[in-house]
Amino acid sequence: MERSGTTPRFAQNPVVNDTGLLEALSHFNREKIPERVVHAKGTGAYGEFEVTDDISDICNIDMLLGVGKKTPCVGRFSTTGLERGSAEGIRDVKGLGLKFDTKEGNWDWVCINFPYFFIRDPAKFPDLMHAQQRDPKTNLLNPNMYWDWVADNPESLHLVLTLFSKLGTMFNWRTMSAYLGHAYKWTMPDGSFKYVHVYLSPNGGPSNENASMDDAMDENINDPDGASRDLYEAIERGDFPTWTAYAQVVDPEDAPDLDFNILDMTKHWNYGFYPKNGSVIPKRAFGTLTLNRNPEKYFSEIECLTFSPSNLVPGVLPSEDPILQARMFAYPDAQRYRLGVNPENPPARPKKPLSLKPGSQKFDEWVSQVSSPAWSEAKEDDYEFARELYEWYPQFRDQEFQNELIDNLAESISQTCDAVRQKVYRTFALVSTDLADRVREGVEKRLETAATNSTPQELPGRARL
């Protein structure tokens, strides 16, 4: 029923008697829900998953048994670190949450666009996110926070050296890879199980490897919603994006003999690229994901959509990965915070959210410093995987690919204070003296140019992380 206007007249009943108006105002005050603290900027679509290969020898999951079987699903793509209004092409880890409506309940795949992450110790997560978000003093981006954290947590270098290459910028969701990252246990009726890592490879190919940092910045300025727009328009015109699903399988008896810990999320399950002398875990294709329908009501269908690694189905169990264990608690807890005032049921009813809610943090030192009492000690393979990646880049593409990594690192680090720069150089030297020397040289050239031109150092709020 449409509301009639409230016309001010003397000797009439007061407005507080207009219960329709009060209801409209109270609904307006409550129609928004809290923003996700991570993965705030996003978009989504509906689709289906089709089994293409028989994997019944390693799997007893109903959704994956039977070539040709199709399962409806809904997915949400997102950035990670910054707020809902940020640009999608920023140098950031990207996310993809998928909710499969199986006959045995919802099964969620909570993925990122790289096969490894910054940390293996979940106690570090709040500080990691604070380091990438806005300075609590200035409310601007501050590279000092980010690089101070990286230097104190060298297990992050594997992903940092990926993010600052051309792989760290992205121009559309349709060609983004997605990795569950964690090992899960796929169980069989006899009680046996395999450790399995699942990932999705875009059939449209990557969209970022020929892009420079300047290209990414131009895209962010010209259309900060470009990736969402591209996905929506592609689906509307019938150009449906597809991904091939792969599984990497490890027998639990073989896991101790591998040269890395499959429960350490800062390492990837190598399928033949690097480390060059490392254990290789072959991949097996088993299905195709297709996104083929846009939502009708974005807020109720996508923004209220939630995911959790704990949303499992019979035949799947979580592994002992500490990051996975922490996420299984944190995601449902975040849903209770974020959706408590919005109990409406979206078409694909979520049970868990795609965010974490870190509490307030006390800073005893300079306000932008990010520290934690729970640093886990660095191990040699933390540097080894980063070193192998750095040395592999020229073989992966060409020398220019590695050169741009150096330029991107130098551009960002040049915006930090001297104390942080020195920490970063020392940390990089543990990976490769060539890496440290080239980054130092690039930073010094930028600082000299800025001094010669009498140009003040770029403000943190304009930082290009």
From Swiss-Prot:
Annotated positions binding heme: 331
Family that this chain belongs to: Belongs to the catalase family.
Statement: the UniProt record of this protein carries the keyword Iron: yes
Protein name: Catalase cnsD
Lineage, uppermost ranks: Eukaryota, Fungi, Dikarya, Ascomycota, Pezizomycotina
Protein's GO biological process: alkaloid metabolic process; hydrogen peroxide catabolic process; response to hydrogen peroxide
Protein's job: Catalase; part of the gene cluster that mediates the biosynthesis of communesins, a prominent class of indole alkaloids with great potential as pharmaceuticals. Communesins are biosynthesized by the coupling of tryptamine and aurantioclavine, two building blocks derived from L-tryptophan. The L-tryptophan decarboxylase cnsB converts L-tryptophan to tryptamine, whereas the tryptophan dimethylallyltransferase cnsF converts L-tryptophan to 4-dimethylallyl tryptophan which is further transformed to aurantioclavine by the aurantioclavine synthase cnsA, probably aided by the catalase cnsD.
Active-site residue list: 39
Signal peptide: none
Organism expressing this protein natively: Penicillium expansum
Keywords in alphabetical order: Alkaloid metabolism, Heme, Hydrogen peroxide, Iron, Metal-binding, Oxidoreductase, Peroxidase
